[in-house]
């Protein structure tokens, strides 16, 4: 199995390039349709998108083994929340790839009796569950980092003898004893949390990249499952952005979120 995992890893770059091209075609097709391009040109773009999708399915054959190996490694993580989110995400990815393999067999003619609509819905359902777990993991890591950053800021303020912004020692408008002061205090706390979030994400590019990539990918299964119709333009744009970010993590491995 290890040999197969290494082999499938070598095809990741080609698969992600095909993915970027596929969603670029989806976006281009939407733009051409909006601008009244010739039906023949639109048909060619749709055919190219379909060929790229089928090619990606071929490149993903056996990726279930890679996902299962990743799940086996994640089981040994010491953090319970990370262990749960990452393991469940990889297991859903394995099921997604398995459904994708069945779809490839149906589209390529090897299994013509396959109900492609049913298997496509199954694959997107597992894909959606995987993305939800990924975003849950991102939210958990962000919360941990924000708590660490907040504690560090508090220690620095205590060391310098400064007060905590928006604390009980602040008087005047917005103080706890001032009528209507709770709303300004809430706004100040919210602003501080947003600034803290921005600082955390700016200081951790892999986490920022992972959040944006998963958020972009989320639109794809939501649209395909009919849970939130975004349209081919939004799906194409989000898929293209996500694919470019995935390619960046291959070119620059330090941008990949670990574990």
From Swiss-Prot:
Disulfide bonds: none annotated. GO terms for cellular component: peroxisomal membrane. InterPro entries: PEX11 (IPR008733). The modification N6-acetyllysine is found at residue 43. It is a single-pass membrane protein. Keywords: Acetylation, Membrane, Peroxisome, Peroxisome biogenesis, Transmembrane, Transmembrane helix. Its main location: membrane. One of its GO terms (biological process) is signal transduction. Residues 211-259 are annotated as: Interaction with PEX19, PEX11G and FIS1 and peroxisome targeting. It is found in: Peroxisome membrane. The chain crosses the membrane at residues 234-254. Homodimer. Heterodimer with PEX11G. Interacts with PEX19. Interacts with FIS1. Involved in peroxisomal proliferation. May regulate peroxisome division by recruiting the dynamin-related GTPase DNM1L to the peroxisomal membrane. Promotes membrane protrusion and elongation on the peroxisomal surface. Belongs to the peroxin-11 family. This is Peroxisomal membrane protein 11B. The gene is PEX11B.
């Amino acid at each position: 199995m290890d040999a197969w995992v290494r082999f499938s890893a070598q095809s990741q770059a080609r698969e992600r390039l095909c993915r970027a091209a596929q969603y670029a075609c989806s976006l281009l097709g939407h733009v051409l349709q909006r601008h009244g391009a010739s039906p023949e040109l639109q048909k060619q773009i749709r055919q190219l998108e379909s060929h790229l999708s089928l090619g990606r399915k071929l490149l993903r054959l056996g990726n279930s083994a890679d996902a299962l190996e990743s799940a086996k490694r994640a089981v040994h993580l010491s953090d319970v929340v990370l262990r749960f989110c990452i393991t469940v995400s990889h297991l859903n990815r394995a099921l997604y790839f398995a459904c994708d393999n069945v779809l490839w067999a149906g589209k390529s003619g090897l299994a013509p009796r396959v109900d492609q609509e049913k298997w496509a819905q199954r694959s997107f359902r597992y894909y959606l569950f995987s993305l939800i777990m990924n975003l849950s993991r991102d939210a958990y890591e962000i919360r941990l980092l924000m708590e660490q950053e907040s504690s560090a800021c508090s220690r620095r303020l205590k060391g310098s003898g400064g007060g905590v912004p928006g604390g009980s020692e602040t008087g005047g408008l917005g103080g706890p004893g001032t009528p209507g002061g709770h709303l300004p205090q809430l706004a100040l706390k919210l602003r501080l949390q947003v600034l803290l979030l921005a600082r955390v994400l700016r200081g951790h590019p892999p986490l920022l990249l992972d959040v944006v990539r998963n958020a972009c990918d989320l639109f794809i299964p939501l649209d395909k499952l009919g849970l939130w119709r975004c349209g081919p333009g939004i799906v194409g744009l989000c898929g293209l952005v996500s694919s470019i970010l995935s390619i960046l993590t291959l070119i620059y491995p330090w941008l990949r979120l670990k574990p």
